[in-house]
C-alpha cells in the first residue's frame, strides 16, 4: 500500500453536526461575495437568443435532466468557456438531515483525492446556502448494467478488458485506504470510448487496518456473507466479494446469488454455491473461486487478483499492476495561456491549482486538458473557439464556490472497445466551432416548463413525482425522510428480461442487521422505513444516452411503511454446472429471451429492498418513519440477464435490444393526452407539412436489428407509431418532429412507465429505425409495453 493520504474521518453515527465541503463545521453557510473582476467583452462568435436563455450554474449552461432522485437531480451541462460536457448533480441540502449531509460532504472529500482514469472525476463544487452543485465527469456510454441488459453477457475477452479497469480502480482506492462499499453493475459507467468509470462514492469511507467497520452498505446480491451475518469487517474484503459478483455478471449475464426474497438470497450467499455456465473458461472459474470465498480472511487481495492468470491473458507482457498516480501537471503553459486569454490571472490560476481549490479556475484548467467535444461536422472546439469568461452581476444567489477538479488522465483504452460500441455519440445541437461568452443572469436550476410538467404529471398520475434515474456518479444521498413526494422508480434502460436495478439503502448496524438479515425476513426490510438514497447520485457521470443515475428509483410515500410482495421464481431449464461439478452442455445462453408477458423469472421488481443498497445506519432511525425506499426491483438473473440460465428464447429481444440505445433522456414534459399530441387529431400531419419535407431524423451510430428498421418515410413511421400508441392507451407528447415522450400505466399500481420513441436514420443506409429509451418505470413494465408496441408496429 502506498503512503496514506490524509482524509478527515467521519463517524458514521455522529449526527450532531455536519461538515461542509472543506471540512469545517458549518451550522450556517455564509455566502461569499461575488468576484470583483470586471466582465470580459463578448467573443465574436457567440451564441445569442435561445441559448442565452438557458439556465446557468456558474460557468455551466444546463441542458437536460439526466437523472432524478428524492433530494437530487442530475443535469447534462456544457462548460461555456471550453465547450466540454459535464454532469451537474444538484442536491437540495434543505431536504437532508445531519447524517445525510455528513455522508454527502464525506463523499465530496473522498472524490477530491481520487485521480484514476477509471473513476469518475469531480471537477468543481459550487455551494450555496441551500444547494450543493457537484460538477462531474460525464460518462456518455451509460451504465454497464444497461449495457448488459441491452447486449447480453460479454465475451471473456471484453469482460477481461473491463474487469482489469475495475480492479485497477478499486485497488487504487484501497491503497488510499478508501473502501467503496457499493460496487455493482449500476455504479459502473462507460465513457465514449467504452472505458469503465466507477461512480457513486456515497457509501464509501476511509478504513484503518485493525479498526473494523460495522455498517452494512451495499446491494444484497453484491453483499459479502459477513454483512448478512452482521459481522464487523476491515473494508477491502467486502469490495473483493462484490468484484466477484461483478465478474460473474459480466461473463454470464446473470447474478451468482439471487432469490425470491431476501431470506432466500441470504441463504444462497451464505452457502456460497453458484452455477458455473458451460461456456465459462476454467481460468475464469478459478478466479471466481478466489473472489467469492465465504471466509473473508481467505478471500484474495486485489494485489493477488491482479496476478491471476485469467486477468492477464493476452496481456502477458503487461501484467496488471497497482496504478501509480502521475505527478500533477500544474504547469501546462498552453492551457494557462488559453485561460489568460479568457480573463483569468496567472496568479489566481497558480493559486487555485497549487491549493487544489476545486473552483471555477481549477475546473477550467482541468477541462481544457480533456478531450474536446466533437460535432457532427467533424469539427471540435479548439483554442481559437474558446471564449472569454464574463462574470454576471448576480451569480448563484450568493454562492460559495469550492470546486474540485482532476488532472487530465490518460485513458486506459479497452482492449475490445470496438466490439460492443453502441453509445449514441450524437452531440448536442450546437454548431461547430462555437464560442461561448456572455453568461446570462443565473436562472432557476429547473425550467418553469419542467416544473409545470412535474405538477401536471403529479396531478394526473396520483400525485406522484416522476423520478428519473440519473447517470451521475455523484454519491447516493442517504436521505432523510421525505415528507411528501413519492417518486416512481427511476429510469433505466432495459432491453429485455427483468434484470433489475439494485437500489441503495442503509441498514443500521448489528442490531438492525440482525432483524433485517440474520433472520432472513424480507419483511423486515420491506416494512422498515428505509431512507431512500438519491437516485440521481450514480447517474452523475453516466452518459446522457444512458441517462440513468445509478441509484435507486424510489417510491417514497408519507404514511405507513409499505409491504412489498415479491414475485416467485421459476428456475430455467438451461444446463449449468455448480462450482464444484463438471460442465454440462446446454443450449446457447446467448439467445436473449423476452416475451410480451411477464417473464418467468422476475425475482424482484426494480427498487425492491432486496435489490437495494443498504447502509447500516438508517434502518434504526427510520423504523417509525414512512417508507422512503424504492419499490421492489427485479434481479439481474431475471429477464435479459437470466438468459444465461434459461433455455427459452424468442426473437422479440432482437426487436428490443437494438432499440435501447443510449441517448440523453430528454426532460419530460406534459404526459397527458392532448389534441396536439394524439394521432386522432390532424395536427401532427399539419405540423409535418409546416416543417417542410427537408426535415430529417437525426443519424445515430449503433447497431440496429433488421426488425426495427424500415425504408418507410420517417413521417409515415411517426404516424404508425402514434397509431399503435393510441391503440395501447398510451399518453404521449411530440417533443420534436421525430421524437415522442410516452407514458403508460398507473402510478398507484407501480406500473407507470415513461419512455421515448424516436425515428432515427441509419448512417450510410437508406433505412430508418425506431429507438426506444426508457425514462422511468420498472424493467418488467417497460419490457411488456415496449415489446407489445414493437410487435404491433407495421413498418
Curated annotation (Swiss-Prot):
Protein name: Serine/threonine-protein kinase MARK1
EC numbers, comma separated: 2.7.11.1, 2.7.11.26
Cross-referenced SUPFAM superfamilies: KA1-like (SSF103243), Protein kinase-like (PK-like) (SSF56112)
Topology within the bilayer: Peripheral membrane protein
Entry keyword rRNA-binding: no
Function: Serine/threonine-protein kinase. Involved in cell polarity and microtubule dynamics regulation. Phosphorylates DCX, MAP2 and MAP4. Phosphorylates the microtubule-associated protein MAPT/TAU. Involved in cell polarity by phosphorylating the microtubule-associated proteins MAP2, MAP4 and MAPT/TAU at KXGS motifs, causing detachment from microtubules, and their disassembly. Involved in the regulation of neuronal migration through its dual activities in regulating cellular polarity and microtubule dynamics, possibly by phosphorylating and regulating DCX.
All copies of domain KA1, residue ranges: 746-795
Entry-linked InterPro entries: KA1/Ssp2_C, KA1_dom, Kinase-like_dom_sf, MARK1-4_cat, Prot_kinase_dom, Protein_kinase_ATP_BS, Ser/Thr_kinase_AS, UBA
In-chain residues carrying the UniProt-annotated modification Phosphoserine: 219, 382, 390, 393, 403, 423, 444, 475, 588, 666
Localization terms from the record: Cell membrane; Cytoplasm, Cytoskeleton; Cytoplasm; Cell projection, Dendrite
Predominant location category: membrane
Key word Amino-acid biosynthesis present: no
Gene Ontology BP, a term: Wnt signaling pathway
Post-translational modification: Phosphorylation at Thr-613 by PRKCZ/aPKC in polarized epithelial cells inhibits the kinase activity. Phosphorylated at Thr-215 by STK11/LKB1 in complex with STE20-related adapter-alpha (STRADA) pseudo kinase and CAB39. Phosphorylation at Thr-215 by TAOK1 activates the kinase activity, leading to phosphorylation and detachment of MAPT/TAU from microtubules. Phosphorylation at Ser-219 by GSK3-beta (GSK3B) inhibits the kinase activity.
UniProt region (Disordered), positions on chain: 1-40, 377-495, 539-700
Cofactor(s) the protein needs: Mg(2+)
Amino acid at each position: 500500500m502506498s503512503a496514506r493520504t490524509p482524509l478527515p474521518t467521519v463517524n458514521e453515527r455522529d449526527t450532531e453536526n455536519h461538515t461542509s465541503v472543506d471540512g469545517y463545521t458549518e451550522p450556517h453557510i455564509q455566502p461569499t461575495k461575488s468576484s470583483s473582476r470586471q466582465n470580459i467583452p463578448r467573443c465574436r462568435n457567440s451564441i445569442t437568443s435561445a441559448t442565452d436563455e438557458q439556465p446557468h450554474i456558474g460557468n455551466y449552461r444546463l441542458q437536460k435532466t439526466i437523472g432524478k432522485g428524492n433530494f437530487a437531480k442530475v443535469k447534462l451541462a456544457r462548460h461555456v468557456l471550453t465547450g466540454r460536457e459535464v454532469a451537474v448533480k444538484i442536491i437540495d441540502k434543505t431536504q437532508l438531515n445531519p447524517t445525510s449531509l455528513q455522508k454527502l460532504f464525506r463523499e465530496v472529500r473522498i472524490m477530491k483525492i481520487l485521480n484514476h482514469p477509471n473513476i469518475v472525476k469531480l471537477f468543481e463544487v459550487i455551494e450555496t446556502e441551500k444547494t450543493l452543485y457537484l460538477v462531474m465527469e460525464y460518462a456518455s456510454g451509460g451504465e454497464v448494467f444497461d449495457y448488459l441488459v441491452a447486449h447480453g453477457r460479454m465475451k471473456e475477452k471484453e469482460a477481461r478488458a473491463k474487469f482489469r479497469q475495475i480492479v485497477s480502480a478499486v485497488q487504487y482506492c484501497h491503497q488510499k485506504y478508501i473502501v467503496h462499499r457499493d460496487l455493482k453493475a449500476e455504479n459502473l459507467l462507460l465513457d465514449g470510448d467504452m472505458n469503465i468509470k466507477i461512480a457513486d462514492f456515497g457509501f464509501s469511507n476511509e478504513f484503518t487496518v485493525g479498526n473494523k467497520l460495522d455498517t452494512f452498505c451495499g446491494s444484497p446480491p453484491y453483499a459479502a456473507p459477513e454483512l448478512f451475518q452482521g459481522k464487523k469487517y476491515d473494508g477491502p474484503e467486502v469490495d473483493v466479494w462484490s468484484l466477484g459478483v461483478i465478474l460473474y455478471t459480466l461473463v454470464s449475464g446473470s447474478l451468482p446469488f439471487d432469490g425470491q426474497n431476501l431470506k432466500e438470497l441470504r441463504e444462497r450467499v451464505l452457502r456460497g454455491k453458484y452455477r458455473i455456465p458451460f461456456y465459462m473458461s476454467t481460468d475464469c472459474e478459478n478466479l471466481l473461486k478466489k473472489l467469492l470465498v465465504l471466509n473473508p480472511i481467505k478471500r484474495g487481495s486485489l494485489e493477488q487478483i491482479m496476478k491471476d492468470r485469467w486477468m492477464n491473458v493476452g496481456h502477458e507482457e503487461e501484467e496488471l499492476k497497482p496504478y501509480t498516480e502521475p505527478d500533477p501537471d500544474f504547469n501546462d503553459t498552453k492551457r494557462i495561456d488559453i485561460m489568460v486569454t479568457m480573463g483569468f490571472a496567472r496568479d489566481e490560476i497558480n493559486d487555485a491549482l497549487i491549493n487544489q481549490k476545486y473552483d471555477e479556475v481549477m475546473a477550467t484548467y482541468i477541462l481544457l486538458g480533456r478531450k474536446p467535444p466533437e460535432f457532427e461536422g467533424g469539427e471540435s472546439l479548439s483554442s481559437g473557439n474558446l471564449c472569454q469568461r464574463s462574470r454576471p452581476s448576480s451569480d448563484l444567489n450568493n454562492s460559495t464556490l469550492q470546486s474540485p477538479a482532476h488532472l487530465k488522465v490518460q485513458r486506459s483504452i479497452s482492449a475490445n472497445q470496438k466490439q460492443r460500441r453502441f453509445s449514441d455519440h450524437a452531440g448536442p445541437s450546437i454548431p461547430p466551432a462555437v464560442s461561448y461568452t456572455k453568461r446570462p443572469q443565473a436562472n432557476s436550476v429547473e425550467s418553469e416548463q419542467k416544473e409545470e410538467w412535474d405538477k401536471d404529471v403529479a396531478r394526473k398520475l396520483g400525485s406522484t413525482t416522476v423520478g428519473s434515474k440519473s447517470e451521475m456518479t455523484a454519491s447516493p444521498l442517504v436521505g432523510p425522510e421525505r415528507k411528501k413526494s413519492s417518486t416512481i422508480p427511476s429510469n433505466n434502460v432495459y432491453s429485455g428480461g427483468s434484470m433489475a436495478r439494485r437500489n441503495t439503502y442503509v441498514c443500521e448496524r448489528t442490531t438492525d442487521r440482525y432483524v433485517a438479515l440474520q433472520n432472513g425476513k424480507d419483511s423486515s426490510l420491506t416494512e422498515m422505513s428505509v431512507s431512500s438514497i438519491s437516485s440521481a447520485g450514480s447517474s452523475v457521470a453516466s452518459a446522457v444516452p444512458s441517462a440513468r443515475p445509478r441509484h435507486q428509483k424510489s417510491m417514497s410515500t408519507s404514511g405507513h411503511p409499505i409491504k412489498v410482495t415479491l414475485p416467485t421464481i421459476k428456475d430455467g431449464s438451461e444446463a449449468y454446472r455448480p462450482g464444484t461439478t463438471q460442465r454440462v452442455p446446454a443450449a446457447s445462453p446467448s439467445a436473449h429471451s423476452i416475451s410480451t408477458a411477464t417473464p418467468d423469472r422476475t425475482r424482484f421488481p426494480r427498487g425492491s429492498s432486496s435489490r437495494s443498497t443498504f447502509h447500516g445506519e438508517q434502518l434504526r432511525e427510520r423504523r417509525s418513519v414512512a417508507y422512503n425506499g424504492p419499490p421492489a426491483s427485479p434481479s439481474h438473473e431475471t429477464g435479459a440477464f437470466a438468459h444465461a440460465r434459461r433455455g427459452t428464447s424468442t426473437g422479440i429481444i432482437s426487436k428490443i435490444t437494438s432499440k435501447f440505445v443510449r441517448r440523453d433522456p430528454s426532460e419530460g414534459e406534459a404526459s397527458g393526452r392532448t389534441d396536439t399530441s394524439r394521432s386522432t387529431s390532424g395536427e401532427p400531419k399539419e405540423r409535418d407539412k409546416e416543417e417542410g419535407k427537408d426535415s430529417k431524423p437525426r443519424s445515430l451510430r449503433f447497431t440496429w436489428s433488421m426488425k426495427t428498421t424500415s425504408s418507410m418515410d420517417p413521417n409515415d413511421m411517426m404516424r404508425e407509431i402514434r397509431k399503435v400508441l393510441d391503440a395501447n392507451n398510451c399518453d404521449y407528447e411530440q417533443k420534436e418532429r421525430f421524437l415522442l415522450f410516452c407514458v403508460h400505466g398507473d402510478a398507484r399500481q407501480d406500473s407507470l412507465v415513461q419512455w421515448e420513441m424516436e425515428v432515427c436514420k441509419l448512417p450510410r443506409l437508406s433505412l430508418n429505425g425506431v429507438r426506444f429509451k426508457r425514462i422511468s418505470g420498472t424493467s418488467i413494465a417497460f419490457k411488456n409495453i415496449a415489446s407489445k408496441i414493437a410487435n404491433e408496429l407495421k413498418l
